[in-house]
């Protein structure tokens, strides 16, 4: 007997998942997509399988704005294990070297300031970055090491939360593209003992914080009790990741032309930059950019 194809739901919104350890970001996305029975889904930047915490998942029309969450600053808490270096820079890699740890709390506190602000990082070999079309982690698994250019990143917070040798817990706030594994490895090198990431928890992704994140266990329980529709309560509006942007409400007349791809004039709009755009009822209809001539050009539109 032929299996009946499951008809997926056309839903839109953002769900902030508290990703469990041991699951890739894509595995987590596909699991939640199945629970929601969603037609279209995407995540907003990978978390390593080792890592837990904030992973915003976009569904339906919200996927059009996932790039702007990829570009957002992130926050983490990480446990740094001093004295041991690994091939991957975290607890999942093979042991490279082991040293005695004679580092004191004051030593660590004194080393932190050099990693605050704008710094240069060399991305790790075990990363999704590509070299000649090949992901670096695939080359690393084949035993290859290739030259990687240093990249500029910004560390806005790097504080010591606890110190229990050989481990220390750090709070990190950073720009996009920052590798906490590399930060910990570089810090371990400065301390002279080496280090790797023993645990990593993302506490912030743009405007989304851990307090808003829903565990997979909660989603599974609610799904078991009420099916996919019961999970809609956890969906946030499509523009939830853009609430820090200025908002512009268009008249009914202007919104009509704007939604048909035409730039419009709005005297109350800012002189430059990107905007969240609403129609005359206050409904979010997309994002726009102020052009050189002062008009508001549509860049991403919500399908009604």
Curated annotation (Swiss-Prot):
Catalytic residue list: 48 (nucleophile)
Pfam families linked to this entry: TruB-C_2 (PF09157), TruB_C_2 (PF16198), TruB_N (PF01509)
Reactions that this protein is recorded to catalyse: uridine(55) in tRNA = pseudouridine(55) in tRNA
Annotated GO MF terms: pseudouridine synthase activity; RNA binding; tRNA pseudouridine(55) synthase activity
EC number: 5.4.99.25
Keyword line: Isomerase, tRNA processing
Keyword Metal-binding tagged: no
One of the GO BP terms on file: mRNA pseudouridine synthesis
Residues that span the membrane, as ranges: none
Assigned protein family: Belongs to the pseudouridine synthase TruB family. Type 1 subfamily.
Known function: Responsible for synthesis of pseudouridine from uracil-55 in the psi GC loop of transfer RNAs. Osmoprotectant regulator of PLC.
Descriptive protein name: tRNA pseudouridine synthase B
Source organism (scientific name): Pseudomonas aeruginosa (strain ATCC 15692 / DSM 22644 / CIP 104116 / JCM 14847 / LMG 12228 / 1C / PRS 101 / PAO1)
Gene that encodes the chain: truB
């Amino acid at each position: 007997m032929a299996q009946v194809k499951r008809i997926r739901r056309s839903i839109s919104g953002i769900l902030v998942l508290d990703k469990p350890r041991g699951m890739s970001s894509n595995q987590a996305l596909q699991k939640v997509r199945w629970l929601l029975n969603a037609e279209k889904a995407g995540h907003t930047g990978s978390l390593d399988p080792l890592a837990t915490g904030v992973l915003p998942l976009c569904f339906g029309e919200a996927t059009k704005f996932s790039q702007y969450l990829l570009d957002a600053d992130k926050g983490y808490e990480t446990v740094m294990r001093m004295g041991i270096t690994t091939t991957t820079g975290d607890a999942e890699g093979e042991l490279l070297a082991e040293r005695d740890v004679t580092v004191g709390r004051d030593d660590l506190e004194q080393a932190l300031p050099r990693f605050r602000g704008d710094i240069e990082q060399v991305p790790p070999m075990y990363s999704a970055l590509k070299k000649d079309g090949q992901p670096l982690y695939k080359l690393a698994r084949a035993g290859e090491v290739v030259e990687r250019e240093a990249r500029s990143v910004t560390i806005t917070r790097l504080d010591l939360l606890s110190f229990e040798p050989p481990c220390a817990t750090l709070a990190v706030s950073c720009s996009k593209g920052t590798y906490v594994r590399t930060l910990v490895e570089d810090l371990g090198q400065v301390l002279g003992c080496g280090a790797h990431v023993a645990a990593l928890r993302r506490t912030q992704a743009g405007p989304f914080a851990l307090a808003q994140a829903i565990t997979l266990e909660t989603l599974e329980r609610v799904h078991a009790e009420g099916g996919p529709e019961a999970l809609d309560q956890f969906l946030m509006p499509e523009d939830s990741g853009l609430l820090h942007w200025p908002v512009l409400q268009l008249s009914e007349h202007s919104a009509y032309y704007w939604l048909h791809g035409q730039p419009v004039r709005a005297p109350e709009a800012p002189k430059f930059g990107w905007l969240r755009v609403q129609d005359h009822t206050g409904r979010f209809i997309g994002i726009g950019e102020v052009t050189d001539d002062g008009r508001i050009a549509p860049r991403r539109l919500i399908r009604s």
